[in-house]
C-alpha cells in the first residue's frame, strides 16, 4: 500500500468556508444582524422541511440540545427511562441525562450497528421512549421498530444526525418516528 498525501488539507472539525460564504456572513454582521438570530434561519428551516418531507423544522444550536428538545416534546421527564443504543455519540445519552431521565442502554445489531426489533421488543415495557440512531445511514427493519413503538404507545425519537438526505425503502430517514433530529456537525454525513 502506498500512502498518498493530499495537496489540500481537509479540516474535520475546524470550520471551512468559501470566500462567498465568508463574505455573506461578514455582510450580514455589518448590516446589524445578530449571530444568534440569523434572519436566514427561517428560510433554512423551511427548505429543510421541504427537502425531508416534513411539516415542521426548528433549528437549535447543537445535536445534544436537539435530542433533549425532541425528548421534551414527546413527554420525557426526570422520572422517565429512555432506550439508548450503546453504539452512538455520547450526546445521545447526555441528552437523556440533561433532562434528568435515565438512559437504558441496549446492545446493537452486529450487522447494522443499530438497535434491532428484537432488542426493542425485549425492553419496550421498561422504557418511556426509544431513541433510534441511524448511524452512518445504516438501517434495517426500521418499520418493525416503528410498529413495536406504536403497539406499546411509546414515542420513537430518530437521531438521524448522520443521515440527512438518506432514505430507507424510499422514505427519508427522520420521517419514521414521532420526531427526529439532524446535525450539521462536521463528522455527520449529508447525502
Give the ranges of each region predicted by the language model.
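PLP-dependent aminotransferase-like
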Residues: 72-160, 167
Amino acid at each position: 500500500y502506498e500512502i498518498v498525501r493530499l495537496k489540500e488539507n481537509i479540516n474535520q472539525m475546524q470550520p471551512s468556508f468559501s470566500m462567498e460564504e465568508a463574505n455573506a456572513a461578514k455582510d450580514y454582521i455589518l448590516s446589524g444582524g445578530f449571530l444568534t438570530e440569523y434572519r436566514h434561519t427561517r428560510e433554512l428551516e423551511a427548505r429543510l422541511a421541504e427537502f425531508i418531507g416534513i411539516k415542521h423544522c426548528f433549528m437549535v444550536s447543537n445535536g445534544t440540545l436537539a435530542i433533549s428538545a425532541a425528548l421534551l416534546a414527546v413527554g420525557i421527564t426526570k422520572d422517565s427511562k429512555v432506550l439508548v443504543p450503546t453504539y452512538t455519540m455520547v450526546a445521545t445519552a447526555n441528552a437523556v441525562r440533561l433532562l434528568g431521565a435515565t438512559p437504558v442502554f441496549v446492545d446493537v445489531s452486529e450487522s447494522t450497528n443499530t438497535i434491532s426489533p428484537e432488542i426493542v421488543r425485549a425492553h419496550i415495557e421498561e422504557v418511556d421512549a426509544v431513541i433510534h440512531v441511524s448511524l452512518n445511514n445504516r438501517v434495517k427493519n426500521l418499520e418493525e421498530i416503528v410498529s413495536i413503538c406504536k403497539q406499546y404507545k411509546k414515542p420513537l425519537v430518530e437521531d438521524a444526525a448522520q443521515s440527512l438526505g438518506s432514505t430507507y425503502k424510499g422514505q427519508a430517514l427522520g420521517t419514521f418516528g414521532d420526531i427526529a433530529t439532524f446535525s450539521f456537525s462536521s463528522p455527520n454525513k449529508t447525502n
